[in-house]
Amino acid sequence: MSQDNATAPTSNFLRQIIDADLAQGTYADRKDATGQPIPPVVTRFPPEPNGYLHIGHAKSIWVNFGMARDYNGRCHLRFDDTNPVKEDTEYVDSIIDAVHWLGYSWSDAGGEHLYYASDYFEQLYGFAEVLIQRGVAYVDSQSAEQIAANRGDFTRPGTLSPFRDRSVDENLALFRDMRAGKYKDGEHVLRAKIDMAAPNIVMRDPVLYRIRHAHHHRTGDAWCIYPMYDFTHCISDALENITHSLCTLEFENNRPLYDWVLDHLRDAGVLAAPLPHQYEFARLHLTYAITSKRKLLQLVTEKRVDGWDDPRMPTLVGIRRRGYTPESIQLFCERVGVSKADSWIDMSILEGAVRDDLDARAPRSVAVLDPVKLVLDNVPADFNEPCSAPVHPKQPELGRREFPLTRELWIEREDFTETPPKGYFRLFPGNKVRLRYGYVIECTGCDKDAAGNITAVHANIIPDTKSGTPGADSVKVKGNIHWVSAAHALEAEVRLYDRLFSDPQPDSGDKNFLDALNPNSKKIVKAFLEPTLATAKAEDRFQFERHGYFVADRIDSQPGKPVFNRVVGLKDSWGK
């Protein structure tokens, strides 16, 4: 989002940390290798390109890019592409597109700040040799299963590897042979030599490098050993002059290893202070949604949804296709805020953000989603009277839209009943209602087919009651229904999306998340729309009066033949 559209930032513990660093000049007066000044606040967003970003990533993007923006710093986009088996350029492209869609940029006066961890493979390898030479890293020849079994748990310490005391020369020779491709996958790993009795299991001689004979999306087959995330991440931060490495709470236990690697490399003289520091904030737990990549992939592969960009998915491509705006995502993040404690955020907050955003900007229109014909019997067959309504009731400068009132109309099936319940003010025989922006009418009856289904409703116009005329209030009515001209309406496909899950925490505990799928999360209807919608372009958003907010589908919608997705209803239908 542009800074012009950003609201005043709310104070939180991350801002307090940054404010203190600025006051102390922790990262002041730095210059890069070319002599260019480095801002005192440099953050980064480092996704692994092994899937599509989801709403949880949006919060991390907002935090990292937003902090950099608010402090006139910069934020880097860095791909943590150290696992060639799971990564693909498809995901790289989708992540770049998603961050751009959210309105953020990684460019500044110093150029583009788009990076890949694979850019640093040679340097990372060199740093690994430095740790070996300092006697704090060793090649372990145990199997992955043995390493896991010997790591211990929270009740017992780990067991030292029988290969832990190899000499520096032997470790260097083995590590270089690993790089040269002389060993099979899993035959050796490089581990840090820290403390196998550490209370924090992360610090029990973590693996730094593993052998993986796999094609990398950028480096091809140049490498057959790849660094682990914990080794790569902190060094990449240091090489890019990151100041504040902001990540979610699941990495809290990894922070000591982050510091351990950087401290050893600083002491070896290959990295210089001031070094970056990692800080953790609460990740986003959204009700009625899942964000596990494995489970999202299962939904896609089992065809429980229509792909990664299914509008019911929590992926950013799905949320975008649903009709959410970048501004609504930012508003949602602002309302959720930044804290140190994990908590569940109700889906209604996300829906409320897009509802508030679109209420302020979306043009109004009319759509009949479950149509039944209404015949006005006391006007001629060629009756055609122009009606108009504001494009937006709070923005008169946008003008008015015009549409015809004719003898035959489409109305919502639920707006007529033969036997009205108490409090029903819409059409039933003998009752009067107003046709929105048109006349007051009185219902006279209905037609049915042989099965008893209502095929048409009949009514008479009450003259001199048209909206906007002196006689508009001459007949008092309680009901007001919307309509479109049967002769002029635009027929279109409308997809009524709802929450994908009916359980607020579908994968908590030992639940099978598939059991919580909402069978009513998608309904496709043939609707009749106000004819002005024929010119709707992909991603144009509207309020369909009395129904909610809708968007022209960015993939399937065509000029003159739009397809609309429901973004959100006018009110929260899930509230207790």
From Swiss-Prot:
GO biological process: glutaminyl-tRNA aminoacylation; glutamyl-tRNA aminoacylation
Keywords: Aminoacyl-tRNA synthetase, ATP-binding, Cytoplasm, Ligase, Nucleotide-binding, Protein biosynthesis
Catalytic activity entry: tRNA(Gln) + L-glutamine + ATP = L-glutaminyl-tRNA(Gln) + AMP + diphosphate
Class of the enzyme per the UniProt entry, highest EC level: ligase
Keyword Amino-acid biosynthesis: no
One GO CC annotation: cytosol
Main location (coarse class): cytoplasm
Annotated positions binding ATP: E48, P49, N50, H54, I55, G56, H57, A58, K59, S60, T248, R283, L284
Disulfide pattern: none
Record's keyword annotation contains Protein biosynthesis: yes
PROSITE patterns the record matches: AA_TRNA_LIGASE_I (PS00178)
Subcellular location: Cytoplasm
Position of sequence motif 'HIGH' region: 47-57
GO molecular function, one term: ATP binding
EC number in record: 6.1.1.18
Motif ('KMSKS' region): 290-294
Binding site for L-glutamine: D80, Y229
Listed NCBIfam families: glnS (TIGR00440), PRK14703.1 (NF011291)
Oligomeric and partner information: Monomer.
Family according to the record: Belongs to the class-I aminoacyl-tRNA synthetase family.
Classification via PANTHER family: GLUTAMATE--TRNA LIGASE, GLUTAMINE-TRNA LIGASE
Full protein name: Glutamine--tRNA ligase
Species this protein is from: Ralstonia pickettii (strain 12J)
Taxonomic classification: Bacteria, Pseudomonadati, Pseudomonadota, Betaproteobacteria, Burkholderiales
